[in-house]
């Protein structure tokens, strides 16, 4: 601030001291002896954004799978055409412990209300599931500025597993992801604008790319009516990569309504899009330790 400019009346802003949290990752033993699950993480707003995404998609029930190495959230959108799989690797958080592999069922609306009350004053979230209270999941939020701890006890159930949803996890296995023939990145703003504009004219759009160093091409054409072409000529500007041989053409038809609803629901600035030969799309985004995957089944059209 210039010496000629004086601060107005009032108390100067207090500089917040943020604790230095060590990320120890996976523990061999829990901190609390009765814990079947312990999850401690210094970024509670990631969970708030995740449940905003579930709300935007109008998901209902959420399956939670806990394993000794990671915690994963599974759900569907309202249309049943998109499958959400969100994973946090235990090695990337402050501490994580799960005794074995087990599943919990939680109601999205119930948990969403809890996260709506969480703001930036809370610097840590701890999730605990205990052997002696299997029907309860504890969410503990800590505000270190005033040494406040808020604990919510949410009723959970042993869920009926949605095997079709769980099976979709194979689509995002490390080996499978290497073999997708086409991928690129959009900002959430670009994704929303492209599919919102297209929805004014057509229900289907074609995604096309020739083999070699050629542009990404999105288009539609209505006989004796209107056509539209959207070309991305600089592959580096959208991180476009492909494994399409030079002599071949990759082409799929996508139902715009599916993508438009996803684009409106997104809670991250950047989205990676991967295409399968069968027409399915995967939308990937990252929020700190969270990897968010949404698989859209365009072969259902």
From Swiss-Prot:
GO BP field: symbiont-mediated suppression of host cytoplasmic pattern recognition receptor signaling pathway via inhibition of IRF3 activity
Keyword NADP belongs to the record: no
InterPro entries: DNA_clamp_sf
Entry's induction text: Expressed in the late phase of the viral replicative cycle.
Gene3D superfamilies in alphabetical order: 3.70.10.10
Keywords in alphabetical order: Host-virus interaction, Inhibition of host innate immune response by virus, Inhibition of host IRF3 by virus, Inhibition of host RLR pathway by virus, Late protein, Viral immunoevasion
Quaternary organization: Interacts with host IRF3.
Family statement: Belongs to the asfivirus E301R family.
Function: Plays a role in the inhibition of host innate immune system by acting as a negatively regulator of type I interferon production. Mechanistically, interacts with and prevents host IRF3 nuclear localization to inhibit its transcriptional activity.
Record-given protein name: Uncharacterized protein E301R
Organism the protein comes from: African swine fever virus (isolate Tick/Malawi/Lil 20-1/1983) (ASFV)
Species classification: Viruses, Varidnaviria, Bamfordvirae, Nucleocytoviricota, Pokkesviricetes
């Amino acid at each position: 601030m210039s010496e000629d400019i004086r601060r107005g009346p009032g108390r100067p802003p207090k500089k917040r001291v943020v604790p230095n949290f060590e990320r120890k990752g996976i523990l061999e033993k829990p901190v609390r002896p009765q814990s079947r699950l312990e999850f401690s993480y210094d970024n509670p707003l990631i969970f708030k954004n995740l449940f905003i995404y579930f709300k935007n998609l109008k998901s209902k029930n959420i399956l939670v799978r806990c394993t000794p190495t990671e915690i994963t959230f599974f759900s569907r959108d309202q249309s049943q055409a998109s499958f959400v799989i969100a994973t946090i690797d235990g090695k990337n958080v402050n501490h994580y412990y799960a005794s074995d592999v087990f599943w919990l069922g939680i109601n999205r609306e119930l948990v969403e209300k809890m996260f709506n009350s969480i703001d930036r004053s809370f610097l840590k979230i701890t999730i605990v599931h205990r052997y002696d209270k299997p029907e309860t999941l504890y969410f503990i939020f800590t505000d270190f500025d005033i040494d406040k701890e808020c604990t919510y006890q949410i009723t959970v159930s042993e869920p009926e597993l949605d095997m079709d949803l769980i099976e979709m996890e194979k689509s995002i296995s490390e080996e499978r992801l290497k073999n997708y023939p086409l991928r690129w990145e959009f900002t959430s703003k670009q994704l929303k604008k492209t599919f919102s504009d297209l929805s004014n004219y057509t229900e289907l759009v074609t995604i096309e790319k020739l083999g070699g160093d050629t542009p990404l091409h999105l288009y539609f054409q209505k006989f004796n009516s209107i056509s539209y072409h959207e070309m991305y000529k600089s592959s580096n500007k959208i991180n476009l990569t492909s494994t399409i041989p030079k002599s071949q053409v990759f082409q799929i038809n996508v139902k715009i309504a599916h993508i438009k609803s996803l684009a409106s629901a997104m809670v991250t600035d950047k989205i990676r899009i991967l295409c399968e030969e069968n027409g399915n799309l995967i939308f990937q985004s990252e929020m700190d330790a969270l990897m968010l995957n949404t698989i859209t089944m365009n072969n259902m059209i």
